[in-house]
Amino acid sequence: EDVYKRQANGTFLKIENTPFDFKEFHEIGERINDDHEQLKLAGGYDHSFMVKDEEDQLVLYDKETGRKMTMTTTLPCIQVYTANFLSGGCNGKDGKPYENRDGVALEAQFLPNSIHIEKEPKVILRKGEEYEAVTTYRFEVE
């Protein structure tokens, strides 16, 4: 939840019956224009989702081609960002300019602002300490 309209404060919002409920497959953009305060603030999806220690924490699937990407991570969150502010600022394949929401970024991370949220893991790495996280992207065709 965003306390200052953009900063996470550690309050977790329920996703059931909201545009953030991806427990069942549906197109990412299917609900992106729904009347929801968080979508309006970000211009689309730019939100962290807490993940459980399961084999397939995030799955993208194209039912037309059968292409599938599965993501797993040892980090507690996956940030989903739907390129809400591209508006022709960079070019893609064959020089075609990318427009808003022409892509999606999936970023394994700690919860944003977790350094200030006591109940979340601290993200400070001190001199001499080591840290390891593993994120896997698996691609296949079904």
Which residue stretches match the model-derived regions?
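Active-site pocket scaffolds in enzymes
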Residues: I15, F20-E142
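Catalytic His-Asp segment of secreted/periplasmic serine-dependent ester chemistry enzymes
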Residues: F12
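Short, small-residue-biased leader/transition segments that mark boundaries at the very start
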Residues: V3-Y4
